[in-house]
Amino acid sequence: MTAHEVNFDGLVGLTHHYAGLSFGNEASTRHRFQMSNPRLAVKQGLLKMKALADAGFPQAVIPPHERPFIPALRQLGFTGSDEQILDKVARQAPRWLSSVSSASPMWVANAATVCPSADALDGKVHLTVANLNNKFHRALEVPVTEALLRAIFRDESQFSVHSALPQVALLGDEGAANHNRLGGEYGSAGVQLFVYGREEENEIRPARYPARQSREASEAVARLNQVNPQQVIFAQQNPEVIDQGVFHNDVIAVSNRQVLFCHEAAFARQKVLINQLRTRVDGFMAIEVPAGEVSVSDAVATYLFNSQLLSRDDGSMLLVLPRECQDHAGVWRYLNKLVAEDNPISAMQVFDLRESMANGGGPACLRLRVVLTEEERRAVNPAVMMNDALFTALNAWADRYYRDRLTAADLADPLLLREGREALDVLTRLLDLGSVYPFQQTGAADG
């Protein structure tokens, strides 16, 4: 059956700021406390979405979350009105205020793991929400992510959205950022590659930074998503590269159809994995980048592998890259050589995503890939699909509500909370989502 990959990109939230919340993510740590520009950030993301949609790649949006998230502060023991709580936490525990104000939901590669209908035992599209339990600010995302996905993929005859795994360390799950799908045509059965950093009875794990994804979680997600057991491979990420800042597999590898583009040091038993894939995937091609041409540290600094690999109508592939790759002489030299060689990657497109990149999120972090047949695509909430009208509306919305500068001190401003809630109220109507946010369900917008 004919199917296409649709990229659902996360909209950057109104409280996008640099707090260094993500240990193991070196860009996040390096840019801590710098001033951010939320309006520029959301527009950089919108420009990427629109450019790719105009080039013929189906594109949709996933909204941001309510931030600052007052219910989480109430759970932590802060009391009073919303304004009183903001004042208390800013004075007593500013780190918590930063955590509950994180715009990290924009990196929707961590929202869920997706199984196309061609791979599922029941013939449905499955999405399992990631629990993101390695980081407090990310674990907060889970309930609203589930509500948003149910509002977008609302036809239960076509889609099954599964709740996240239990919030325990053993079942740490980071979603599609640790998942690749390889195969031929999108509508044909493929091989799903689940990548983990640790497993309970395996002492091979990183020493410096945490391995966020467990094998136990990957296996559970594969079961929930009803992936045909004959179409699954579980592989361990190289713990040495996790210790160099590769906190998700999509920082060191990206796949599309029959191609796996990765660093030569990406996986723990890479030769074995490559041979497995060669056996299981017709026409499989591994493009392994040697350390002599691009070091792991340069790959992390430029997010070379946090790129999007997209299929064009002529069968060739487009590599969507952050500007940091172009700015790095060695990486750019390698890429120009790559597209000149005999392989499916024949073109590159560079985007300025520096607001997101400074927090450790490149093009691939910002999107959730969902393979859909034409019938399934018609069943998706049509209001989230990118087109000229939505692009214009979202830019006007951003101009109205987003600030052009934000520091950690601004997070305590009650006006920011009110601006955010008003903006999300408008957005849910624009995207026909219903009342997906807690403040809409409880009347908290009134104070």
Swiss-Prot record:
Keywords per UniProt: Arginine metabolism, Hydrolase
Cited InterPro entries: AstB_sf (IPR037031), SuccinylArg_d-Hdrlase_AstB (IPR007079)
UniProt enzyme class: hydrolase
Binding-site residues for substrate, renumbered to this chain: 19-28, 110, 137-138, 212, 250, 359
Annotated catalytic residues: 174, 248, 365
Domain of life where this protein originates: Bacteria
Listed GO MF terms: N-succinylarginine dihydrolase activity
Known catalytic reactions: N(2)-succinyl-L-arginine + 2 H2O + 2 H(+) = N(2)-succinyl-L-ornithine + 2 NH4(+) + CO2
Entry's EC annotation: 3.5.3.23
Pathway annotation from the record: Amino-acid degradation; L-arginine degradation via AST pathway; L-glutamate and succinate from L-arginine: step 2/5
GO biological process: arginine catabolic process to glutamate; arginine catabolic process to succinate
Membrane-spanning ranges: none
Function: Catalyzes the hydrolysis of N(2)-succinylarginine into N(2)-succinylornithine, ammonia and CO(2).
Cited PANTHER family: N-SUCCINYLARGININE DIHYDROLASE (PTHR30420:SF2)
Family in the record: Belongs to the succinylarginine dihydrolase family.
Oligomer and partners: Homodimer.
Annotated protein name in UniProt: N-succinylarginine dihydrolase
UniProt organism field: Salmonella paratyphi B (strain ATCC BAA-1250 / SPB7)
Taxonomic lineage: Bacteria, Pseudomonadati, Pseudomonadota, Gammaproteobacteria, Enterobacterales
